[in-house]
Amino acid sequence: MNGDEQLEALRARITELDRAIFELVNQRLELVRELKQVKVDHDLPFVDPAREASMIEQRVAENPGPLSKDGVRSFYVTLLALVKRELG
């Protein structure tokens, strides 16, 4: 396999992973939408900063790498902000 073929194969795999990531993010968003409705039905606040912090630290602890601890934190802070924007 020459260099161009290797690049194309790697790029194709990255595209597959990107699609899988978006599928999972959309599934997560739907679950959070359901969770939000349960919270609304029970007069609970949508955002729970203590729960968010705990969840982020759990994901940091579970991360096998190579993504750094700071990278995991940044990813989840961004993901949670996105979900809040999407769901209001």
Residue ranges and their predicted role:
Residues 1-88:
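Domain-level signature for soluble enzymes in the chorismate/prephenate branch of the shikimate pathway
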